[in-house]
């Protein structure tokens, strides 16, 4: 929506409620929740088949947190409410605007919430945003007053009559909530969890299936919140100070594509002696445009990258041998989350298994598998709509179209109903061949330690010593437990045994004792977690309720 077309809020200084859709999420219900589609990024689509070894955590609604940080209006945020909690909030507090963020599979939840708003607070304006905005006729179907497609900070500032070009203030966000694996809660002390940093939104690569790229303008388009490396460095210093972190989860679709900004950040990190760790998203060909020395110096310690296949037609992979890229990164202590699409146009029943084997051969620390899905709002959706190959062109029943179960279109080669089987085979095969992610992470962390813990550059040496600090105890115990758990899987058991010997040789007696004693305790925890999962127990995020200072002042005055 262009600036001139942005409406203005009806009342001066409105009270605003920002909210995510209601839970519970990891169950099958009438509002489109699905047990197969929990509110957990990793367990949903990355470590789905790893059982007790799956990484479990929740991520806050970062977009809503960014919005409320960058407007001047009394506001509250209700994140992960139950339906009862959302209803109670509408009955308890008077709001002039209620803003809902949602994705297409949660359409029925957004619809229910809009009906409740009209029933309980009929004067409130309803604003809906997020990827749900790409659904056909979404404003009319929900009965919303406004649907925001694209960058929301500037839209909301215009909506409120405020300066849309004012500097962006980044909220203080820890990247994960309630992290656990193998039945053990992971550390939540200051510094244990990375800070979330959002420098840009959108991706100029413009892959036809990419909902994020389409949301922010498509090919060649993106929105920078921080144009320069200097601006980004100052924000990172603030996050470091306020959250006591040295690790940053950089939520930017292709962070390294903004080369001038990234290299200036590297200069400043060197000048100010910052040994930060960066978790980034990047494409293979962009990674290859940097030297490994630049990536290590920049603090890149984890990369999420696409591995779309040997014959991929996507530009972001052209000229890049992804196997070589992954091996090079891992040799320098950089972990990789590979992303593979199941059901590309060229996939057939005859070559699908080979495509999966190619993906698995990368042996990335984590591996996301997703179905090729024409999401509403993307060029791929429009292509299939024109061809008449969409299963549900109006997206009237999209609760099961979330990338983990079924196609939204008729595939030219794969019979309908087989896609979910192929997807699960990919997850299972990756786990069977490469073992749990914790084993792979330990191997790469050890490589980084061995290469850089004695580096001449003090800044780099400090980072790798920090990142490898858990190798002699925590990682060693996990590797011991993995070896025992996978006794019947010769390949994984052998890898665990070899890695354990490497760790013991590197760290000596402390590691030998900790790996055995800690490993036995951890194996018992893994068995308990296995039993918990067998009972069908699921994980749900806690509800967060946060209020701005001026919202609290108004409540006190009233």
Model features per residue range: what roles?
Residues 25-28, 134-138, 218, 260, ...:
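Flexible glycine/acidic-rich beta-alpha junction loops that bind and position SAM and/or redox cofactors
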Residues 18, 100, 128, 250-252, ...:
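Conserved beta-strand positions
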Residues 2-244:
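Acidic, low-complexity intrinsically disordered segments
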Residues 1-41, 91-96, 402-558:
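Radical SAM enzyme core and accessory elements
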């Amino acid at each position: 929506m262009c600036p001139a077309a942005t409406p203005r809020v009806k009342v001066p200084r409105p009270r605003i409620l920002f909210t995510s859709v209601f839970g519970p999420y990891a169950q099958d219900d009438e509002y489109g929740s699905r047990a197969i589609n929990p509110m957990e990024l990793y367990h949903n689509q990355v470590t789905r088949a790893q059982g007790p070894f799956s990484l479990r955590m929740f991520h806050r609604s970062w977009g809503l947190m960014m919005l409320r940080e960058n407007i001047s209006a009394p506001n509250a945020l209700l994140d992960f409410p139950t339906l009862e909690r959302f209803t109670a909030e509408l009955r308890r507090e008077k709001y002039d605007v209620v803003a809902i963020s949602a994705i297409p599979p949660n359409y029925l939840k957004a619809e229910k919430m809009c009906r409740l708003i009209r029933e309980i607070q009929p004067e409130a304006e309803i604003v809906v945003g997020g990827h749900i905005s790409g659904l056909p006729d979404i404003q009319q179907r929900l009965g919303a007053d406004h649907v925001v497609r694209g960058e929301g900070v500037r839209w909301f500032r215009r909506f409120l009559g405020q300066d849309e070009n004012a500097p962006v203030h980044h909220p203080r966000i820890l990247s994960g909530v309630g992290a656990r694996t193998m039945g053990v809660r992971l550390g939540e002390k200051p510094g244990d969890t990375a800070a979330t940093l959002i420098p840009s939104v959108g991706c100029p690569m413009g892959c036809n299936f990419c909902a994020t790229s389409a949301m922010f303008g498509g090919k060649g388009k993106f929105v920078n919140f921080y144009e320069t490396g200097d601006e980004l460095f100052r924000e990172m210093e603030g996050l470091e100070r306020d959250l006591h972190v040295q690790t940053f989860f950089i939520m930017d679709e292709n962070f390294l594509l903004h080369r001038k900004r990234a290299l200036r950040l590297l200069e400043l990190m060197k000048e100010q002696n910052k040994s930060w760790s960066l978790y980034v998203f990047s494409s293979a060909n962009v990674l290859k445009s940097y030297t490994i020395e630049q990536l290590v110096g920049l603090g890149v310690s984890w990369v999420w990258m696409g591995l779309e296949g040997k014959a991929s037609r996507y530009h972001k992979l052209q000229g890049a041998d992804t196997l070589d890229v992954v091996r090079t990164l891992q040799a320098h202590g950089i972990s990789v989350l590979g992303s593979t699409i199941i059901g590309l146009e060229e996939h057939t029943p005859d070559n699908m298994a080979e495509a999966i084997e190619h993906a698995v051969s990368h042996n990335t620390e984590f591996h996301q598998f997703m179905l090729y899905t024409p999401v509403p709002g993307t060029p791929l959706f429009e292509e299939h709509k024109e061809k008449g190959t969409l299963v549900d062109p109006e997206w009237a029943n999209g609760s099961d179209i979330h990338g983990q179960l079924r196609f939204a279109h008729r595939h030219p080669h794969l019979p309908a109903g087989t896609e979910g089987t192929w997807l699960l085979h990919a997850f299972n095969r990756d786990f069977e061949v490469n073992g749990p992610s914790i084993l792979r992470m330990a191997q790469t962390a050890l490589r980084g330690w061995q290469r850089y813990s004695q580096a001449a550059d003090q800044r780099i040496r400090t980072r790798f010593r920090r990142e490898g600090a858990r190798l002699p105890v925590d990682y060693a115990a996990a590797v011991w437990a993995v070896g025992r758990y996978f006794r019947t899987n010769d390949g994984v058991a052998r890898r665990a045994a070899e890695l354990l010997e490497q760790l013991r040789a590197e760290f000596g007696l402390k590691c030998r004792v900790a790996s055995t004693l800690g490993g036995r305790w951890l194996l018992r925890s893994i068995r308990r977690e296995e039993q918990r999962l067998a009972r069908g127990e699921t994980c749900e995020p806690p509800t967060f309720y946060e209020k701005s200072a001026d919202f609290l002042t108004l409540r006190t005055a009233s």
